[in-house]
Structure formats: C-alpha cells, structure tokens
Amino acid sequence: MSELTPLLKASINFAYIGAFVFVALGVYLSYRRGRLHPLLLLCISAISFSWIEAPYDWAVYAQFPPAIPRMPSWWPLNMTWGGLPASVPPGYIAYFVLPAVIGVALGRWLIATFQWRAPLTLLVTGLIVGSLWAFMFNAILGAKLGVFYYGYVIKGLALWEGTRHQYPLYDSLAMGVQMMVFTYLPGRTDT
C-alpha cells in the first residue's frame, strides 16, 4: 500500500488532533486550578512511555503500511519494521487518555447511581473499558482493517491466528490493566 487510505488518514488525524485537544485541555484545567490537573499528568505519562512502542513492535513484529510517514532514521528507538510511524508518540496521548476519560465518566456514573465503592468501581471500570478499547482499536481497527499487523502471536492466545489479521488477546488484557491505573488516578475524589 503506497498511499494513505482514508482509514490511515483518519488514524493519523486521531493521533495528532487527540493529542492536541487533551494536552490543551489539561493545560487549561491546570491553569484554572493553579496546579497540575490529572488530565495533564495522564498526557505526560502517556507520551513518556511511547518509547516502548518500538521494542514492542520489534518483539511482536508489528508491521505498519509503508505509506504512513515515519520518524527520521536517526530516531534512537527506530526498531519497528520499516521505521516507527511519526504519529505514534502523540498518538499515545489520544490512545491512552480517551479510554481513561471514558472510564472515569462511566465509573463515576456507576458510583453515583448504585452507591458502589469508588476505588474498586474505578479499577474494575478501567479494566473493562481498557480491554474493550484495545480490542476495538487494535484488533478491529488495527489488525482486521489494516492499520497495522502483528507478525507473531502466542499460539492459542490469539484471534484469527495464522492469518494476516491475527490479534494477541493478551494485548487487550495489558491495556485493561494500564487503564485501571489511568482511570483510578483522575477518577478518585480524595484530595
């Protein structure tokens, strides 16, 4: 695929626009509060561990279409097959912060509606929202529709195993665990 499809363009726009919106909102809320807002801290956290994408891609042989613009060749962590897509670092903000915001809203609604305990509700909500988000984003949008592919998966722990569209289910679980933290931190109500 030598040119950007509408899906690839939408994915790249999601990365850049999502990052801009969340960082701008985090800066605004921090300014208004007079101290760092949890949303800005999530943005900083998300982009700070975007470095892991290259070694992760190398380990599972993640492959991106060649039409996606790449980081320059001198980029220190350019281990991804074909080079790391330039939209990955800002994309981490949009990819990780949006499900956290959804998890916080859903968790707070569940707490208010059913009078459930806040910490446990936020953690479980984060696990479920994060797992579903990763499945929809990585399995369906990514692997099934062709934004990227997984070259290797652990036998028996993948969907569509052995095909170009194979997806490791443990990827969804890992995202769920990450979202437990990302949902709890901004969702907690103690000061």
For each feature predicted by the language model, list its residue ranges:
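Aromatic-rich, lipid-facing transmembrane alpha helices and their immediate juxtamembrane interface loops
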Residues: 1-191
